[in-house]
Amino acid sequence: MSKTSRANKYVYFFGGGKADGNESMKNLLGGKGANLAEMAGHPNLRLPVPPGFTVTTEVCTYYYQNKRTYPSVLKTQVQEAISKMEKLTGKKFGDVKNPLLVSIRSGARKSMPGMMETILNAGLTEQTIKGLIEQSGDERFAYDAYRRLIMMYADVVMEKAAGVEPKGGKGIRKVLDEKLEKVKHEKGYASDTDLTAADLKALVKDFKATVKKVLGTEVHDNPNEQLL
């Protein structure tokens, strides 16, 4: 790889028995990203690591050195990585019949237990959930995945990353958790697993309205806007 291409490379792909990086690249890929690359690409391990990609630590550095903006090529590189994932999984990001969903996990050069954030099921929307229900045959599973996305996205992206100060010291995650607990109490449920598909569908609707009321904006219903 040339110096120019390496300097402009911000996304490292792994999957299909191959990986752009390895375990020696923790400064660039973070501990989690480097280890995933090693597991996915090591010829002797042959571990069934699902395809994915790592956005390098250099993007974080760039962001803070350039007035909170991203490298101009980052969006294209992420889209190229998503295309590779689609080819390997047979699913398509944003597709209404067979949607590809992704987990977004933060990482760092050094281990920071309890400090990292996660967003699950990015790519779920009012339209793509229909495909997840069709593919899984489980409406309850699909709406449980959707309500988890809304809770995580509102907390991590719309509040914390946006620098929004929680009203009354109560963050959006706490507000949504209380709504979830209220439904469980009213229905006499002992755990989240007792919630029915109808319960979760109603919670999703309530969560969306609550996020808009508390944070003043809606959860993105476009897969690409969720991701980028």
Regions found by a protein language model. Give the residues of each.
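Nucleotide/phosphate-binding sheet-loop regions of phosphoryl- and nucleotidyl-transfer enzymes
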Residues: 1-228
